[in-house]
Curated annotation (Swiss-Prot):
It comes from the Bacteria. Residues 28-55 are annotated as: Disordered. This is Uncharacterized HTH-type transcriptional regulator in cgkA 5'region. Residues 42-55 have a biased composition (Basic and acidic residues). It comes from Pseudoalteromonas carrageenovora (Alteromonas carrageenovora). The lineage of its organism: Bacteria, Pseudomonadati, Pseudomonadota, Gammaproteobacteria, Alteromonadales. Residues 84-105, 130-153 bind DNA. Residues 67-163 form the HTH araC/xylS-type domain. It holds the Pfam family HTH_18. One of its GO terms (molecular function) is DNA-binding transcription factor activity. Keywords: DNA-binding, Transcription, Transcription regulation. InterPro entries: Homeodomain-like_sf, HTH_AraC, HTH_AraC-typ_CS, Tscrpt_reg_AraC-type_HTH.
Amino acid sequence: DHIIPLQIKNSQDSQIISFFKADKGSVSRQVHPPWPVPCKSKLQEQDSSESKESKAEQVKINNCVVQNAMLYIENNYFNDINIDTVAFSVGVSRSYLVKQFKLATNKTINNRIIEVRIEQAKKVLLKKSVTETAYEVGFNNSNYFATVFKKRTNYTPKQFKRTFSS
């Protein structure tokens, strides 16, 4: 497999880099690079000689970490991701990310990963089988997917499909 940059855009305010994994001449799922997307904050622009930061500025940094983590989850839910891969992708330690994520969202990272997968599954399930949906949204086991789906939506995947398919 080779990683091929497809789009690179730089500006003062943003940096977008898209990568795709190429497998035998075909382009497959998007793979996001394992480094944080730069967040613009006043603190990052301050002179590094300043020794103290206000609480509000510290929160901006932490929110930036959480924003990057959420972005990574939303863009990679279909992959085999966990707390460690999310922490690595945003460039912080596991324990730091867990603490900041919980403070900012009042949710765990695993809870957010499952939440995103279930929301995507609701869309996919209307067009594909339960097993195909499970694997497409990042579950490695269709029975576990069905259990989690039922717990989160109060519908089994088949009930959901019957109820909401047009």
